[in-house]
């Protein structure tokens, strides 16, 4: 009986211990879940767009030229594909960069041209979705008639190591457009976008530098994207400089018609989009499109464009300007253009 009592007492102790441990674990779950939630939100908004799910899986082989009156019906939900006459082709021109440089504005301005057909959403094919295959990619494109240009824009291509080789594999004749902007203001704009979606981030200064105002942290993507010369070096291994057009993000704001005119020349298009299509919106501090014939009102980019930047201490700005200066000068030499950032 004594042995039986001893076993009974042991079972009671274990049951009590198990209850205590369960209570402690439940108490830890709430803050742990909150941490996981915040980290997930940061990753969602700080990383480039994710690969959209495919409607059906195409054969992973390069796609031959599409015969007339046929089309691939493979596409991703959420990426609208225009219907109608014509056929789907691989893009002859790509806006490959850079994030927060003005790529969305340029794409919307170019879409005014009757000979430009462009995918509105960013497919992220050459950086995140390449395993879907070229047939899948072509199936996303809008239909075009002979003489029209197919385009898409994904700004993260410019900083993706594998993108130049992959694009060259699709077509070595692809024309490449890079919209660049002062890398300091670009980084602040990048941070402002992430902060608007993920409140509670560390300060810009804390992310840009190690140990206060120590070395610049080039591991942070907002800083790394602005090393334009380094990224261009990678692209020039596959494409000659003549295949590139570098658009000034600053001039795209101050003189949109002039910059869009250069792009139309580069694409071999007639200058259809001119200053008559633009007006400057003083509230947004950004050019908007005048209303087209039959349209009810002028069209500006979304509310996320032209958002106010957080205040960044002048010492931080000056340190970053000094850091970028040699990279900027090399970029000027490589492109033959002085963008006036120094």
UniProtKB/Swiss-Prot annotation:
UniProt protein name: Heparan sulfate glucosamine 3-O-sulfotransferase 6
Organism in which the protein naturally occurs: Mus musculus (Mouse)
- Positions of glycan attachment: 281
Q: Where in the cell is it found?
A: Golgi apparatus membrane
Q: Which residues lie on this side of the membrane: Cytoplasmic?
A: 1-31
| Keyword Isomerase on entry | no
Q: Which membrane topology term applies here?
A: Single-pass type II membrane protein
Give EC number(s), comma-separated.
Answer: 2.8.2.23
SUPFAM superfamilies (alphabetical) = P-loop containing nucleoside triphosphate hydrolases
**Keyword annotations:** Disulfide bond, Glycoprotein, Golgi apparatus, Membrane, Signal-anchor, Transferase, Transmembrane, Transmembrane helix
The family assignment reads: Belongs to the sulfotransferase 1 family.
Give residues annotated as binding substrate: 122-128, 153-156, 220-221
In residue numbers, the region (Disordered) covers 56-75
> Which GO cellular component term is one of those annotated?
Golgi membrane
Functional description taken from the UniProt entry: Sulfotransferase that utilizes 3'-phospho-5'-adenylyl sulfate (PAPS) to catalyze the transfer of a sulfo group to heparan sulfate. Unlike 3-OST-1, does not convert non-anticoagulant heparan sulfate to anticoagulant heparan sulfate.
Q: What does the tissue specificity note say? A: Expressed in liver and kidney, followed by heart, brain, lung and testis.
Q: Which residues bind 3'-phosphoadenylyl sulfate?
A: 100-104, 181, 189, 305-309
Which top EC class is given? transferase
GO molecular function terms attached to this record = [heparan sulfate]-glucosamine 3-sulfotransferase activity
Q: Which residues lie on this side of the membrane: Lumenal?
A: 50-342
């Amino acid at each position: 009986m004594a042995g039986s009592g001893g076993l009974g007492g042991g079972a009671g102790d274990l049951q009590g211990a198990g209850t205590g441990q369960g209570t402690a674990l439940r108490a830890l779950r709430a803050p742990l879940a909150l941490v996981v939630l915040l980290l997930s939100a940061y990753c969602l908004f700080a990383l480039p767009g994710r690969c959209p799910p495919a409607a059906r899986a195409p054969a992973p082989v390069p796609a031959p030229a599409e015969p007339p009156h046929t089309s691939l019906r493979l596409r991703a939900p959420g990426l609208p594909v225009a219907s109608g006459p014509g056929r789907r082709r691989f893009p002859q021109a790509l806006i490959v960069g850079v994030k927060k440089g003005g790529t969305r504005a340029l794409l919307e301005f170019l879409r005014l041209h009757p000979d430009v057909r462009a995918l509105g959403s960013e497919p992220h094919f050459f950086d995140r979705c390449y395993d879907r295959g070229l047939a899948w990619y072509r199936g996303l494109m809008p239909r075009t008639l002979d003489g029209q240009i197919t385009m898409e824009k994904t700004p993260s291509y410019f900083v993706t190591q594998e993108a130049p080789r992959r694009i060259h594999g699709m077509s070595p004749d692809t024309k490449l457009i890079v919209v660049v902007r002062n890398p300091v203001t670009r980084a602040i704009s990048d941070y402002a976008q992430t902060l608007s979606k993920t409140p509670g981030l560390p300060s810009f200064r804390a992310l840009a530098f190690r140990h206060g105002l120590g070395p610049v942290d080039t591991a942070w993507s907002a800083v790394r994207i602005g090393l334009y010369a380094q990224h261009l070096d990678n692209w020039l291994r596959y494409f000659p400089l003549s295949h590139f057009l570098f658009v000034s993000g600053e001039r795209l704001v101050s003189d949109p018609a002039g910059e869009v005119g250069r792009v139309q020349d580069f694409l071999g298009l007639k200058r259809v989009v001119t200053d008559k299509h633009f007006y400057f919106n003083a509230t947004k501090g950004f050019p908007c499109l005048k209303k087209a014939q039959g349209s009810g009102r002028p069209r500006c980019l979304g509310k996320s464009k032209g958002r106010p930047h957080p205040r960044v201490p002048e010492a931080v700005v000056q340190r970053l300007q000094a850091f970028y200066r040699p990279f900027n000068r090399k970029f000027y030499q490589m492109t033959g253009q002085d963008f006036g950032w120094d």
